[in-house]
């Protein structure tokens, strides 16, 4: 049940608001919300006596609906200024509507907590994501026809670079030969032979190193571009609302795992809208009739 709920509640974005009220002997507090599609929770944190409260017994009571949809009253805290002026509830969550009252004592009593609202994501953000997916798919289609011509261009460029490197090597060799001719006039005839033997492996090593450096990067570049194009051609598709049969199957699976479904029609309708994003009233009524038959 928890896994299915996490999966279905993913489009909802929680928001937290501060909550606080003051209770007196003749003043109750009613917490109500508009009948919208968002889920609301009242999380109570602390109950404490206010300044000027008498040293007498104060009993704080909450009235809300139980799982069966019937009203129920629960004692939240019992306070006394000289014994226990404050109580921490540690996140006591109640689904509205809720009535908070001071059953015993004159007050004042302060209650603080949080108002939790599960808000659906804006439709504008979803439309922007769809537009980005469309742009990626269009750019992928446009770049596909010209992809085959990039490799020969790289090969031609590589060959041109090798020719330029060879020309540079020849120029360097000519300069070295000119210097050697000037030096040969002062030494014996055996010296040029030794120098030519020493220069030959160095020239070959330079050419082999240059050829090795120029020829290696061509392969990984083409593979990276092809993998990026494959990612552009497979955009994500947004998930739409589930069908009635799929929703029934998910509910039945959650019941078999030990979960339960709301028994009150209003809560069941709100549960279907939020969890499965179902807006068809006929389909919702069909699901409610199916729920009552279980």
Swiss-Prot record:
Entry-annotated residues carrying N6-acetyllysine: 32, 150, 154, 213, 229-230, 250, 257, 267, 273, 292
Site positions per UniProt: Interaction between pentamers: 55, 80
Position(s), cross-link Glycyl lysine isopeptide (Lys-Gly) (interchain with G-Cter in SUMO): 230, 263
Residues carrying N-acetylmethionine: 1
Cross-link (Glycyl lysine isopeptide (Lys-Gly) (interchain with G-Cter in SUMO1)): 32, 248, 257, 267
Protein name according to UniProt: Nucleophosmin
Cross-link for Glycyl lysine isopeptide (Lys-Gly) (interchain with G-Cter in SUMO2), residue positions: 32, 141, 150, 216, 248, 250, 257, 263, 267, 273
InterPro entries: NPM1_C, Nucleoplasmin, Nucleoplasmin_core_dom, Nucleoplasmin_core_dom_sf
Residues with PTM Phosphothreonine: 75, 95, 200, 219, 234, 237, 279
One term under GO cellular component: ribonucleoprotein complex
Modification N6-succinyllysine occurs at: 267
Domain of life: Eukaryota
Function: Involved in diverse cellular processes such as ribosome biogenesis, centrosome duplication, protein chaperoning, histone assembly, cell proliferation, and regulation of tumor suppressors p53/TP53 and ARF. Binds ribosome presumably to drive ribosome nuclear export. Associated with nucleolar ribonucleoprotein structures and bind single-stranded nucleic acids. Acts as a chaperonin for the core histones H3, H2B and H4. Stimulates APEX1 endonuclease activity on apurinic/apyrimidinic (AP) double-stranded DNA but inhibits APEX1 endonuclease activity on AP single-stranded RNA.
Modifications the protein undergoes after translation, according to the UniProt entry: Acetylated at C-terminal lysine residues, thereby increasing affinity to histones.
Motif (Nuclear localization signal): 152-157, 192-198
Compositionally skewed regions (Polar residues) per UniProt: 203-222
Record region (Disordered): 121-249
Biased composition (Acidic residues): 121-132, 161-188
Disulfide pairings: none
Biased amino acid composition, Basic and acidic residues: 189-201, 223-235
Phosphotyrosine modifications at: 67
Signal peptide range in chain numbering: none
Region feature (Required for nucleolar localization): 243-294
Protein's organism: Bos taurus
Region annotation (Required for interaction with SENP3) ranges: 1-187
């Amino acid at each position: 049940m928890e896994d299915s709920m996490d999966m279905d509640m993913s489009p909802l974005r929680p928001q937290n608001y501060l909550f606080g009220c003051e209770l007196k002997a003749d003043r109750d507090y009613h917490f109500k919300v508009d009948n919208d599609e968002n889920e609301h929770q009242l999380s109570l944190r602390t109950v404490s006596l206010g300044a000027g409260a008498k040293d007498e017994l104060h009993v704080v009571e909450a009235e809300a609906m139980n799982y069966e949809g019937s009203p129920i009253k629960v004692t939240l805290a019992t306070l006394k200024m000289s014994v226990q002026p404050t109580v921490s509830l540690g996140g006591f969550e109640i689904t509205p509507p809720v009535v908070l009252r001071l059953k015993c004592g004159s007050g004042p009593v302060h209650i603080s907590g949080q108002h939790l609202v599960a808000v659906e994501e804006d439709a504008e953000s979803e439309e922007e994501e769809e537009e980005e997916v469309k742009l990626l798919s269009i750019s992928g289609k446009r770049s596909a026809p010209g992809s085959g011509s990039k490799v020969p261009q790289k090969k031609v460029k590589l060959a041109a670079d090798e020719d330029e490197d060879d020309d540079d090597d020849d120029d360097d060799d000519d300069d070295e030969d000119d210097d050697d001719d000037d030096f040969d006039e002062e030494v014996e005839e055996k010296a040029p032979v030794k120098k030519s033997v020493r220069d030959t492996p160095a020239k070959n090593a330079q050419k082999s190193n240059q050829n090795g450096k120029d020829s290696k990067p061509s392969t990984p570049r083409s593979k990276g571009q092809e993998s990026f194009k494959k990612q552009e051609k497979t955009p994500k598709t947004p998930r739409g609302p589930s069908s009635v049969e799929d929703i029934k199957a998910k509910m039945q699976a959650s019941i078999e795992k030990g979960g339960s479904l709301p028994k009150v029609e209003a809560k069941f309708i709100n549960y279907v809208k939020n969890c499965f994003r179902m807006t068809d009233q006929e389909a919702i009524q069909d699901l409610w009739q199916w729920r009552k038959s279980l």
